[in-house]
Amino acid sequence: MKNIRNFSIIAHIDHGKSTLADRIISECGAISDRLMSNQVMDTMDIEKERGITIKAQSVRLNYKFNNEEYVLNLIDTPGHVDFSYEVSRSLASCEGALLVVDASQGVEAQTIANVYIALENNLEIIPVINKIDLPSADIEKVKHEIEHIIGIDCSSAICVSAKTGVGIKELIETIITKIPAPKTNDEAPTKALIYDSWFDNYLGALALVRVYEGNIAKNEEVLIMSTDKRHIVQDLFYPHPLSPIKTKKLESGEVGVIVLGLKNVADVQVGDTITLTKNKAKEAIGGFEKAKAFVFAGLYPIETDKFEDLRDALDKLKLNDSSITYEPETSLALGFGFRVGFLGLLHMEVIKERLEREFNLDLIATAPTVTYEIYQTDGEILKIQNPSELPPVNKIDHIKEPYVKATIITPSEYLGNLITLLNRKRGMQVKMDYITPERVLLEYDIPLNEIVMDFYDKLKSLTKGYASFDYEPIEFRVGDLVKLDIKVAGENVDALSIIVPNEKALSKGRELVKAMKEIVPRQLFEVAIQASIGNKIIARENVKSMGKNVTAKCYGGDITRKRKLLEKQKEGKKRMKAIGKVHLPQEAFLSVLKID
């Protein structure tokens, strides 16, 4: 056991984490150069395309050092803010972490968040400066940033280039000498932490575990502690990107995959504890929670008969990603669909893209919303995710909305524009710190609702892509909020309702009806597009009717004849207006997203 090292890699997107993992794998000789594909650790196509790691992957490597065989378990973690829960459970399975920072870009916001998780878990952190082959690399500046922001001594930081392979050997030797071996206790009751789970078409739901105490052998009966369900261990193996290595037993301190023959990943929830039935652990491993959805959106199939296909697709995705929540909902405008909960915006994009790509569905997504707490006058508290569920104004005492702590690192030349954007988004400054004269760290408390629409895109375009951003939820706070409804031809369009701050309601309403006017097709009768709060109309635009020349068939003749025809047309239009239906195109639902 003293020769096992469990470690993970912490890095911001694009700082070269997956490439570094590939280099370490090939240096240990786990995969021959012929079979080595870029980003071995990333298994989903969408991960390779977007260059991000979504699911935590693992690999067991063997390395000979000072005439002793060592086992290195590399546990890959996602770098993106939405997947910080996956990061926390991956890091809890390790004794050490490599903090990878790009030599040309320096420390970024998401790196800080993940380092703090590692420090909370008392991991040994090894600073690694990557991409030293780049002409723009500034190693001393990056060392200063790591020491200033994170407070880790960088005098012995390891400089590598994952692309060319410089410094990789030295890095592996540092992992062996610096990261402690797992503390183990073979005699204690078995405790194993599930830090990832996925679905395999042949073997069912698989649990990737780190054994803390005791051991697990094939054919033993195990107990999953949160559900109290019992299962027989059908198979055990060590993780490997190409072909898993079978084993009869997982000892304490080891990382491995358990096959229990389950049909559903929800039965092996990430963060749960597995123990043996015959010698049960007294308590589960602490510090874990179920992944919570923060952002909600309605997903509707464009072809209404595809509703069941969408349900099947969501069921299948749920097998692999237990953090998605969904329930059926109906909309008068869009028909049948689902209200789906996501970990964050990137997660929402990835899921929508996977539904469209892997299951050939065409989907309409409504504007993303967050959870609101509604305190009613009768003392009842409601939690709603859909604006159309908001009770009437006279029944509401006050509304609370979720706030997040946003951390932003930006070049100082963009600071003014950025602060203007944050103030417009109702942000409150908590801290401002100059890391170097050229880079600033900002901390803001900001309502989650202001971030979910298009904040990230605006931040990137204001700072030419140089700023980085991360957020974590803090609490619910009272807000002066109202529901803005959109009426088209007198009918409420429920899918376009949004909850907005009272002071922005008027301008938002005006912008929305203006945007809608451009999109709604002209009808034979005039169509009014109105924005309302409760029963009060606050903005209105008219879509002019298409003219039809009813007097064309009169050749000369009496003016009263023409008047009679025009009066008749007026009557017809009035009747049509009363019963006419307007079909809204897909762009109308997207226009809500583009309003600032």
UniProtKB/Swiss-Prot annotation:
GO terms assigned for molecular function: GTP binding; GTPase activity; ribosome binding; translation elongation factor activity
GO cellular component, one term: plasma membrane
Assigned keywords, A-Z: Cell inner membrane, Cell membrane, GTP-binding, Hydrolase, Membrane, Nucleotide-binding, Protein biosynthesis
Similarity remark: Belongs to the TRAFAC class translation factor GTPase superfamily. Classic translation factor GTPase family. LepA subfamily.
EC number(s) given by UniProt: 3.6.5.n1
Location(s) in or outside the cell: Cell inner membrane
Transmembrane segments: none
Catalytic activity reported: GTP + H2O = GDP + phosphate + H(+)
Chief subcellular location: membrane
All copies of domain tr-type G, residue ranges: 2-183
Top enzyme class: hydrolase
Source species, domain of life: Bacteria
Pfam families recorded: EFG_C, GTP_EFTU, GTP_EFTU_D2, LepA_C
An individual GO BP term: positive regulation of translation
Membrane topology: Peripheral membrane protein
InterPro entries: EF-4, EFG_III/V, EFG_V-like, EFTu-like_2, G_TR_CS, LepA_C_sf, LepA_CTD, LepA_IV
Protein name: Elongation factor 4
Main function: Required for accurate and efficient protein synthesis under certain stress conditions. May act as a fidelity factor of the translation reaction, by catalyzing a one-codon backward translocation of tRNAs on improperly translocated ribosomes. Back-translocation proceeds from a post-translocation (POST) complex to a pre-translocation (PRE) complex, thus giving elongation factor G a second chance to translocate the tRNAs correctly. Binds to ribosomes in a GTP-dependent manner.
